[in-house]
């Protein structure tokens, strides 16, 4: 794993690319989410965790930020929903994420699936303050960059306008909004929300701090 991800990071860095949307930290059984088959490190969180860590460390040692996919875990998703409770997730899907957090993962992508047993409603996790701020940042103690899954995905666009989705993601605690269906509308929605006081400038600064902290770390490593 270290050798493979080291080779990937070296190639990316040679082209000036400083972030990789990998590794996939989900765990999935043979009967689980078919879209993840062959992309994960297995069906057991305790076994997969050191492999995820090896991938993260190998990327980041070469100044390429790892982005762990896809919190809270899509391995057992049915009809766009995770049916496990918080305690069940802590003992299974969260093991890889928790371990990588403790080992300094730069960024975590939050999924567009919902987790009603954890959040109490069907809000997509990428737009849920309960999932991002309370669980990921609070329970798991993560203070790195949070990236949403693609906001142009039908799970989002079927229920939210581009502007509303962008605002909801930032209010929930996300730092990077990935691929809204219409960037201009998403951007204007954020500007309008700041003007209205729905999003404070301090909230934007929090995200900028997390992003620049990683950029500065990588730049400093390159200088050294």
Identify the residue ranges that each predicted region occupies.
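Aspartate-rich (DDxxD/NDxxD/DxxxD) Mg2+/diphosphate-binding motifs
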Residues: 38
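Short coil-to-beta-strand
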Residues: 16-27, 104-105
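Structural signature of the thiamine diphosphate
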Residues: 211-223
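Short, conserved phosphate-binding/catalytic loop or strand-edge motifs used
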Residues: 27-35
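Second-shell residues forming the walls of enzyme active-site clefts
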Residues: 43-203, 210-213
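Flexible, glycine/charged-enriched surface loops at secondary-structure junctions
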Residues: 199-205, 220-223
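Active-site-adjacent structural elements in enzyme catalytic domains
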Residues: 1-16, 20
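Short alpha-helical functional segments enriched in proximate histidine and acidic residues
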Residues: 11, 15, 58, 214
């Amino acid at each position: 794993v270290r050798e493979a991800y080291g080779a990937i990071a070296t190639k990316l860095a040679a082209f000036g690319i400083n972030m990789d949307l990998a590794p996939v930290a989900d765990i999935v059984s043979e009967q689980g989410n078919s879209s993840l088959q062959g992309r994960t490190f297995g069906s057991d969180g305790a076994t997969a965790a050191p492999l995820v860590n090896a991938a993260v460390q190998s990327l980041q040692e070469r100044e390429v930020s790892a982005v762990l996919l896809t919190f809270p875990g899509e391995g057992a998703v049915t009809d766009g929903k995770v049916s496990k409770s918080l305690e069940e997730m802590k003992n299974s899907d969260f093991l890889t994420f928790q371990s990588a957090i403790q080992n300094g993962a730069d960024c975590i992508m939050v999924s567009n699936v919902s987790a009603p047993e954890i959040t109490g409603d069907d809000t997509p996790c990428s737009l849920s303050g309960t999932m991002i701020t309370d669980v990921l940042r609070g329970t798991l103690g993560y203070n790195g960059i949070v990236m949403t899954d693609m906001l142009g995905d039908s799970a989002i666009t079927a229920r939210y306008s581009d502007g509303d989705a962008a605002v909801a993601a930032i209010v929930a605690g996300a730092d990077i909004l990935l691929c809204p269906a219409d960037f201009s509308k998403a951007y204007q929605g954020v500007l309008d929300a700041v003007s209205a006081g729905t999003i404070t400038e301090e909230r934007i600064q929090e995200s900028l701090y997390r992003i620049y902290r990683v950029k500065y770390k990588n730049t400093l490593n390159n200088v050294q």
